[in-house]
Amino acid sequence: MNKLLVSPSPHIHAAVSTKSLMRDVVIALLPAVIVSIVFYGFKELVVLGVSVASCVLIEYLITRYLLKKPSTICDYSAVVTGLLLALNLPYTTPWWVVFIGALFAIGVVKMTFGGLGQNIFNPAIAGRVFLLISFPTYMTHWEMPAGLFGADAVSGATPLGLVKEGLLNEQTVSQVMSESGLSYAQMLFANLGGSVGEISALALLAGFVYLLARKVIKPYITLSIWGTVALVSLIFWLAAPDKFTDPLFNLLTGGMVLGSCFMATDYATSPMSVKGGIVFGIGIGFITLMVRYFGSYPEGMSFAILIMNATVPLLNMWFHQKKYGRK
C-alpha cells in the first residue's frame, strides 16, 4: 500500500512528510540550542527539557485520551513547539511557569483547533505572550549569561530594554550605546541579556540557511520582514537619530531573527501565496517597529506575529492561488 504523506498548507510538491519537515526544523534549531546551553549553563537545560517534555506529554494525553485519536507526537511538531517556546523564555524562568506556557501553547492554541495544520496562531508565540501577560515578573527578569561552568549571573537588561529605559531618562541612543558598551559584534555572535533565543543571531541564521538549503521554507516572508524593518527604521533614524535606533540594531536585537526565520514562516499560520506572504511579512515588520518605538514594551515581534496570524484567512482569500489550467 502506498503511504500518503500529508503536510499543512502550503503543500510541497515532493514526497516530504510532516515528520521530515519538523525533523529538519529541530536540526536547524540545534546551533541556537547549543549556544544557549554553553552561555546560560545548566539552568537552560532545565528550561529546554521541561518545555519539550511538557509539550510532548500534553499533546499525547490530549490526543489519546480526550480526542481518542492515534498519537501524533512522532511527527516532531510538539518537539518544535517546545524548543521554540524555550527559546522565547528567559533561562531563569521557573519550571512550573514553563509547564503552564506549554499547556497553553499545546492544549489551548494547538489542540483546541484540531492539531497541527488547523491552529490559527503560532503555539510557541501564543504561549510566550500568555506568560508575558500572566507572569510579567518572571518574563522580564533578565540575567547576563554565566556560562556552563560559570559563577552566579548578574542581573542585566536586553539591548532593546536598555535603549527604551535610556530614552525615558532623556538620554540619546548614542549615549545609551556608549555607556552600556553595546556592540554589533555582541548582537551578532552572543553574550547579551534577554530571552534564550536572543543569545546569538549568527546561530539562528545558520539554522535559517539550513532550512533554505533543505527547501523546508521559502525566504520571501523573512526577507519582507527584514526589508520592512530596515526601510522603516532607516526613515525614523535619519529623521531623529538621537531618538530612534538604526536598521542594523533593529535587525539583530530582540526576537527579530528567531521570529522572522522560524516562527513567521510556520506553514500552518502563514499565507499560502507568495503575495500574501509578502504582505504578511510587511505587516509583521511594521508592527514590530511601531511597538519598539512607541509601545510600552521594548519588543514587539511576538505581538506582531500573533496579529498577522489573525489576518491569514483574509490574506488567503485576497491573494488566493490560481487553480491549475485557469487564468
Question: Which residue stretches match the model-derived regions?
Answer:
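Alpha-helical transmembrane segments in multi-pass membrane proteins
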Residues: D24-A32, V47-E59, S77-G82, A86, ...
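Membrane-interface helix-loop-helix junctions at boundaries between adjacent transmembrane segments
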Residues: L84-L89, T93-A153
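C-terminal ends of transmembrane helices
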Residues: L57-K69, I106-G117, A206-K215, C261-S270
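Long hydrophobic alpha-helical segments that form multi-pass transmembrane helix bundles
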Residues: P123-L205
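Cytosolic-side transmembrane-helix boundaries in multi-pass membrane proteins
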Residues: M1-R23, Y293-K327
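Structural signature of hydrophobic alpha-helical transmembrane segments
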Residues: F42-S54, T92-G101, M187, N191-A201, ...
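N-terminal signal-anchor module of multipass membrane proteins
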Residues: M1-V56, Y60-T63
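Loop-to-transmembrane alpha-helix initiation sites
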Residues: I120-A124, P247-G254, G277, S296-M308
